[in-house]
Amino acid sequence: MKTVLIVEDEKMIRQGIKTMIMRSGVPIETIMECNNGETALEILKEQEIDVMFTDIRMPKMDGIELVQKMQSLEHIPLTVAISGYD
């Protein structure tokens, strides 16, 4: 069973991603959510996350900076970057 973290500042997008994951049939133990990279980094420091979906553009800390900072962590999740940015 996998633990998933969704990092997205727009609530509707977070809910959509969560719904798609739940309908995928992949065995998921926990789906966690947060709305910025700072909070995500704190979660990643405290909990082993298997898969992370992250937006690129977010307030406080964007997805690019989050991915750069998490490289120093002991466990680095499989990361999927998502964005509506043109």
Predicted regions and their residues:
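Non-catalytic signal-transmission and effector/linker regions of two-component phosphorelay proteins
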Residues: 1-3
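Two-component/phosphorelay signaling modules centered on CheY-like receiver
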Residues: 10-32
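Conserved phosphotransfer cores of two-component systems
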Residues: 25, 45-48, 70-76
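Acidic catalytic/metal-coordinating carboxylates
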Residues: 36-39, 62-65
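Hydrophobic alpha-helical motif in two-component signaling modules
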Residues: 41-44, 53, 67
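Receiver (REC) domain active-site loop signature in two-component systems and cognate sites
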Residues: 58
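A short, hydrophobic beta-strand element within the central beta-sheet of small alpha/beta folds
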Residues: 76-86
